[in-house]
Amino acid sequence: MTNLEIVKSTYEGKTSEENGRNLAKYVVEDISWTEAKGFPYAGTYIGLENVTQNVFNRLGSEWIDYKFIPEDYVASDDKVVAYGTYTGTYKITGKSFTARVAHIWKLKDSKIISFEQFVDSQTVNDALK
């Protein structure tokens, strides 16, 4: 698979579980995963277990239908950028949001070594209030 195909596989599976399995298949053990400053889950997490605990589990338990809708991808050598839109409804407040987002993935030898998120976090934070 190409780097672009690997990254696409983490978004475009038939189910969230399939996307998660694809992510687990292609990440290095010590992946560096950065959620943007100002985002509710901001920080850098090392290793898929930490990412799952601090990001994915929270997204699944705190939001209704939280998702990333890819608009397009740009690939160059060892980097792939996916950009599009986040949507979801915060369970506690019942408020929905839409936010533009870009994800920068870095790969080495067909393995994902890092992920960095850039997002308009204001609309996400507004849904929390």
Predicted regions and their residues:
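A beta-strand edge to alpha-helix "cap/lid" segment located at domain peripheries
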Residues: 56-129
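Generic anion/oxyanion-binding catalytic loop in active/binding sites
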Residues: 12, 40-41, 113
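Short acidic-aromatic low-complexity motifs
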Residues: 1-30
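A short, structure-level motif marking secondary-structure boundaries and short turns
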Residues: 4-5, 40, 87
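A solvent-exposed, acidic/Ser-Thr-rich amphipathic alpha-helical stretch
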Residues: 20, 25-76
